[in-house]
Amino acid sequence: MSEFAFTEAERAAIYRAIAERRDMRHFRPGPVDPAMLLRLLQAAHAAPSVGLMQPWRFIRVTDAALRVQIHALVDAERRATAEALGERSDEFMQLKVEGILDCGELLVAALMDQRERHVFGRRTLPHMDLASVSCALQNMWLAARAEGLGMGWVSLFQPEQLRQLLHMPAGSEAVAIICLGQVDRFYPVPMLQMEAWAEPRPLQDYVMENLWTAP
């Protein structure tokens, strides 16, 4: 055991948060404690980022009318997605894919503008800025689960429409709509698995040695 390892209880808590993290869609009414929200944002801001560029930006949506407008954008994309799914369209429309009008806090996570100035680590992999934002959101997700707070990542929207709605600068890009709030329970398994939409595959299907050998 490394001398730098956490205690057994601390390690167990971290692995539990990872295992029990869920993409939540069902929330009960009620605000999120401001101190807790700050802790979640601090957790996100502590994420690693390519070239230390910290490309994430968070917009807290507190205006009720704006929340309704965001919901309308998501609902329009939900219907477009259903149409694109073909034979699974009706099945998809039965899924609850967001909790925008129900959650206690609504955030929009975005990529900053003028990202082209940051070349370190992005010259051949420019999408590492998106990877950095994803790390920040995963930090927030795990912190939320540890706090007993539900979090849902909504990706059903047209980024340009949301950018304009929120008066974001040219060159920036909306990445995620984040729902945070109290829940009655956490799903025992991912919701899409509960709803028989998809089944996760075991780890051994995704780990290879030396060469790409999986089908």
Model-assigned labels for residue ranges:
Residues R78-A84, M168-P190:
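A glycine-rich helix N-cap at a beta->alpha junction
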Residues S2-A13, A17, M24, I177-P215:
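C-terminal helix-cap and adjacent tail motif
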Residues I18, L40-A44, I178:
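Short alpha-helical scaffolding segments that buttress acidic/His motifs in well-ordered protein cores
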